[in-house]
Design a protein with these regions (language model features):
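Transmembrane and membrane-interface helices of multi-pass
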Residues: 1-136, 529
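Membrane/wall-proximal cationic-aromatic binding patches
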Residues: 83-184, 189-204
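Short coil/turn linker and secondary-structure boundary residues
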Residues: 3-6, 141, 150-153, 451, ...
Length: 534
């Protein structure tokens, strides 16, 4: 009970700090209401004359007719985000607000809510069908039989799409980690610019050895950490307007990280050093395929101090290692919390613990606090590697580490303070690191392909030599010959050749591909599509 109260207070302090920091904008938002209260007695409402009423009605009819004419003027446009498609077929509030305005987008959302609107499946370019060639990461799925025996229109169209979607080729890295263990870590807000060789040496070693990804991003999506985890663990893009991870809790998730490892005879564990049922993890984790889930409130509080905020990653790693070390093959997943905002000593126990270790660095107090939280994770990883080495498990264990999202607890100026060589824009702010490390890789393998967290699962499945169908995941194997793409929550994207801003740039050949990735990610979630795959 005390543990839960402490955690709630930690989040309350964070929320309160955000309110204080944005007080000016909140006042501006409330200003019309405040002025109305002050001056309402001085406002006179006169009864309208019939002529004036008719004038207003006529103006509304003319405006409405003109709007319909404009919307239908590009009905035959091939642009997936044409005004006609945005109004009738496509759910894309960010771009709708830019096209129609906020008020119209809001009213359209209300209307669609009551009619249970769903995106229409708009067929884009179709790939050539790929046979079950052994050079591809595909499985023997008979899509023709599935199509012939299905009556649901959307499911049929999904079968057709995935049947003809181009799979990834196997490559020289296929199966190099076969039968090795995996420790997969989603690090709360961890960031490459907080990693210093002399301050966080283990993190520095991990990010500069194994596979080194120079153009990896961790975009933030609609539900922050929950969506970051969803993407990391499923290889799917989150769906706007819903809690994707929670919604998936009743679905067949047989292609998720734990489900795939479980299918390949691994014991699967999940750990989180915060409240066990936050974001409904006590429901979503088992459904994903984790056989044992331990967090504060369902057992971890007996092993670590769950009465501080945020809790210690070091304690969690130290006290859970023995759970899985003796298994033949294991997947251990950690969702950390020590690097959680905010980063002031007044209400962050990890900052209080480690701040003296960074006090001589030339940064502002908030940035120093952020760096100090990474020390806790660094020590956790240092001890983990020592334990693996002591038990002769290091060579047989792969360590994966990536963030859930960028550290939005820091301002843009504070982020630029961390890396003075970069002026951040809305996309570059998400550039980060991906660790895929195994001690048998003696030299760093440099990867320049553009990628993000939706690409991690297909990359790992190929490295571990799993029999999987790459067409059914939205991301791509980063180590394949496919051109990589980083997709952001407003449907902007970056490739090696292109930097596309969805709200400002008019056309790009790849924006239909981005539309497809969002559409089919949503349909997989909403239709529980994987249950149809035999």
């Amino acid at each position: 009970m005390l543990s839960g109260a402490k955690q709630v207070m930690g989040f309350f302090n964070t929320i309160f700090a955000c309110i204080i920091n944005n007080a000016f904008y909140i006042i501006i938002l409330l200003l019309p209401f405040i002025l109305f209260i002050i001056f309402n007695k001085k406002i006179n409402f006169e009864k309208l004359k019939l002529k004036t009423i008719l004038y207003y009605i006529g103006s509304i009819i003319i405006s409405f007719t003109f709007a319909l004419f404009i919307i239908n003027s590009d009905k035959n446009s091939k642009d997936i985000y044409s005004k006609y498609n945005l109004y009738n077929n496509v759910y894309y509030p960010t771009y709708s607000a830019k096209t129609f305005g906020i008020v119209k987008t809001f009213s359209l959302d209300i209307y669609r809510y009551f009619i249970n609107f769903e995106d229409k499946i708009i067929i884009n370019d179709v790939f050539n069908e790929i046979n079950n060639d052994s050079n591809y990461n595909v499985t023997n799925i008979n899509f023709d039989d599935l199509i012939n025996n299905e009556k649901d229109y959307d499911i049929i169209k999904m079968h057709e799409y995935f049947k003809n979607k181009e799979p990834s080729l196997k490559n020289k890295y296929t199966g190099i980690f076969k039968d090795k263990n995996l420790i997969f870590i989603t690090g709360e807000s961890v960031n490459i610019n907080a990693i210093k060789k002399d301050i966080t040496p283990t993190l520095y070693m991990l990010t500069h050895n194994g596979f080194v990804f120079n153009n990896f991003y961790t975009p933030i999506y609609y539900a922050s950490t929950s969506d970051g985890e969803y993407t990391n663990l499923t290889g799917l893009l989150p769906t706007e307007g819903t809690w994707s991870m929670i919604k998936s809790s009743n679905n067949n998730m047989k292609y998720s990280l734990p489900a795939m490892f479980k299918t390949n005879d691994y014991k699967t564990y999940a750990y989180h050093n915060n409240t066990y049922n936050f974001y409904n993890r006590d429901i979503t984790y088992p459904n994903l395929g984790f056989e044992k889930y331990t967090a504060c409130g369902n057992g971890l509080e007996k092993k670590i101090n769950c009465n501080i905020w945020p809790e210690s990653d070091l304690e969690m790693f130290n006290e859970t290692y023995n759970d899985y070390k003796n298994d033949d093959k294991f997947l251990a997943y950690y969702m950390t919390v020590s690097t959680h905002l905010n980063y002031k000593t007044t209400n962050n126990d990890i900052v209080k613990k480690n701040i003296n270790l960074v006090k001589d660095l030339d940064y502002s107090s908030n940035v120093l606090g952020f760096i100090s939280t990474h020390i806790e994770l660094d020590k956790a990883l240092e001890n983990l590697i020592k334990n693996l080495k002591k038990d002769n498990l290091l060579d047989d264990t792969v360590i994966v580490l990536l963030a859930d999202h960028f550290p939005y607890g820091l301002s843009k100026n504070e982020l630029e303070e961390l890396n003075k060589d970069i002026k951040y824009d809305n996309n570059l702010i998400h550039k980060n690191f991906l660790v895929i490390y195994n001690s048998t890789l003696k030299e760093p393998i440099i990867v320049d392909n553009y990628s993000s967290n939706i690409d991690v699962l297909p990359t790992l499945y190929n490295l571990f030599g799993f029999n999987y169908d790459s067409r059914l995941l939205i991301g791509n194997d980063i180590l394949s010959n496919d051109d990589g793409m980083v997709i952001f929550n407003d449907r902007s994207f970056i490739t090696k050749d292109t930097k596309y801003n969805a709200l400002n740039d008019k056309t790009n050949d790849k924006k239909n591909l981005v539309y497809d990735k969002y559409l089919y990610s949503r349909l997989i979630l909403e239709k529980d599509y994987y249950k149809y795959i035999k």
